[in-house]
């Protein structure tokens, strides 16, 4: 399965006809938040593949343009607190990050983040019984605690995500939120059976499932 994952930064060539020259044969797109909805719509319109997304803390509740208002990328599938099936893949997600101000969108307290994760648990347990595995791809905006995160509260990782990774062992965990400015920054870390990937900007990955 070949995946284009995006987050946090608009990449000029992905928002131009050049996308068709540089991105080939992807099966789906994963968006990890803090991206304009129109940008995500453009990508799936050009590539003609499904897009699965979560929102980030800088995403608007409503986005406006000449075509009216949108509350999500049209044609995309929201993964927040949901388990979704695409062909033989099992995906689930959690949006947002740690709450750092009262008025911010898509921010959660520690307790709320645990509840977001626990909302996924019943169906993941059923999947384990039915399919022998609970989850293939976990999609979030924030990182797990201590993995690709930063010391400030806004960018600190989410402990509930570490628990989900340990208990349900998805093959991959895609996240964004933490910007990457240095070439030597670690963006992929194996945690038990899960490869955690910071997809800041974009990545194209051939997944082994």
What are these language model-derived features?
Residues 83-87, 162-168, 180-209:
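Binuclear metal-dependent phosphoesterase catalytic core
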Residues 5-7, 28-34, 51-57, 79, ...:
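Active-site neighborhood of phospho(di)ester-bond hydrolases with catalytic His/Asp-centered motifs
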Residues 23-24, 44-48, 71-73, 131, ...:
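Short, conserved loop/helix-junction motifs that constitute active-site signature segments
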Residues 10-14, 35-41, 57-64, 98-104, ...:
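Active-site environment of divalent metal-dependent phosphoester hydrolases
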């Amino acid at each position: 399965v070949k995946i284009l994952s995006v987050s946090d930064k608009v990449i000029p060539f992905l928002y131009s006809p050049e996308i068709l020259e540089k991105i080939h044969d992807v099966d789906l797109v994963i968006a990890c938040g803090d991206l304009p909805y129109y940008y995500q719509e453009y990508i799936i319109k050009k590539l003609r593949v499904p897009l699965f997304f979560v929102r980030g803390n800088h995403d608007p509740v409503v986005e406006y343009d000449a075509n009216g208002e949108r509350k999500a990328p049209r044609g995309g599938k929201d993964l927040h607190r949901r388990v979704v099936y695409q062909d033989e893949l099992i995906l689930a997600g959690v949006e947002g990050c740690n709450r750092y101000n009262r008025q911010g969108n898509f921010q959660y307290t520690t307790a709320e983040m645990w509840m977001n994760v626990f909302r996924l648990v019943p169906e993941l347990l059923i999947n384990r019984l039915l399919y022998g595995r609970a989850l293939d791809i976990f999609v979030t905006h924030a990182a797990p605690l201590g993995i690709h995160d930063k010391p400030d509260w806004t960018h600190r990782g989410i402990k509930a995500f570490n628990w989900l990774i340990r208990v349900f062992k998805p093959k991959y965990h895609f996240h964004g939120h933490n910007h990457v400015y240095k070439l030597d920054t670690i963006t992929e870390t194996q945690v038990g059976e899960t490869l955690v990937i910071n997809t800041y900007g974009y990545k194209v990955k051939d997944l082994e499932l």
